[in-house]
Amino acid sequence: MIRVEKTTLAIIGLGYVGLPLAVEFGKKFSTIGYDINQSRVDELESGTDATLECSSEELAQASLLEFTTDLSALKTANCYIVTVPTPVDSSNRPNLTPLIKASETVGQVISKGDVVIYESTVYPGATEEDCIPVVEKVSGLKFNEDFFAGYSPERINPGDKEHRLPTIKKVTSGSTPDVAEFIDNLYLSIITAGTHKAPSIKAAEAAKVIENTQRDVNIALVNELSLIFNRMGIDTLDVLEAAGSKWNFLPFRPGLVGGHCIGVDPYYLTHKAQQTGYHPEMILAGRRLNDNMGKYVVSEVVKLMLHRKLQVSGSKVLVMGLTFKENCPDIRNTKVVDLVSEFKDYGCDVDFLDPWADPQEVHQEYGITMTSNIDELSTGKYNAVILAVAHNEFKAMGVSSIRDLLPEDGVLYDIKYVLPKEACHPKKHNPSIRVRGKCRWQHSTPQGFAEDRDSPSSTTDRFRRHPPP
């Protein structure tokens, strides 16, 4: 068995999860950061991280870390950590292609006595049933005799500068007791928050997938409550704050649920459940409800426009924010894009503004042309403005600057509860429509949208519907 102090690591995948891991290990161990994207490697070698997870100073501190796209360079490692995405396909079925390809990569370079650790979120059993057989086939080695494996689910929270890799407790597991001990000690060398050693790889896999599934289901509950209270003319936030005065009331809030984990991971669990012959009811119902919240937001905005006798078809709508959370460039599976198709169904012309998102990446991923320059916006140009992401730049604009984008009777819909209540009133105060314009969601922590992948359960959006007079 490898001794921790003799470990040479290879991190497979240098995205939001892999890079912070490589940087932390690279401060203490000889570490190879491997990615198939040459431009990503070039960027990191220049001391820049486009994901903004690691600063130039942090990259420089990892003096034992080198980056490469050269597969042969991985042969010097004796411990491989796989940190690739695990998405779903268009039918919401698990897509293990990145994981299988990463396993093939490991299989080409792994040697006797080596250890491979998976961090990607999967359904219980995926590591041993789907990944390890690939490593065995490609390498010609036998699992738990020639090489060993473990699973330690990632808990990276993109954009969160408070909860960083070393300060988040790590779940670890291994294919044998000795391997489990080695993996646990390896992570303890960089995780100041400590570790939790799970009794099996499957238990660790299941623990990870239910973290996000639990959040998704709870958000679905409060999303449904917000729809009910809206019909009853009750302020949802008032209800949640009152209920929250009890010590054991869970502080979930409604919101758009997208991103690359909370809106994806439940499908991994339901897929495996269905393979066992069980059809999960609550989890899938929650997914359906959460996926429809974008449609609900647009329908509410359209109602406000009609109430103000605004022409909906042909109207100009500005959506402020596109990333799946505030102050973060990550656009993966952002549910803000759902607003586009819904508004276009009503014949609206939609513009996007996001100072954090890369316009080229946005166009490539979603076919959307957007601007990142706030100064390009024209006064009074839009019939409706949707504040969808609480970027600091939007907060700095202030109420007057944002309202200047609208005509006198324009609709300002504050999803993120960034602005004070009165900001959502029409410029010409009219009590008959004042209350209809205050339909807002607020986020309760620095996390951003409820779409976030690994935020605490309380870091979701708050929906506020104000009752009619």
For each feature predicted by the language model, list its residue ranges.
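A cross-taxon signal for low-complexity, glycine/charged-rich
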Residues: Q442-T445, A450-T459, R465-P469
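Structural/interface elements that position substrates and couple domains in central-metabolism enzymes
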Residues: M1-S432
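Intrinsically disordered, low-complexity regions enriched in Ser/Pro/Gly/Gln/His and often acidic
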Residues: I433-R434, S455
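N-terminal compositionally biased, intrinsically disordered segments and leader/signal-like regions
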Residues: T8, D70, P446, T460-D461
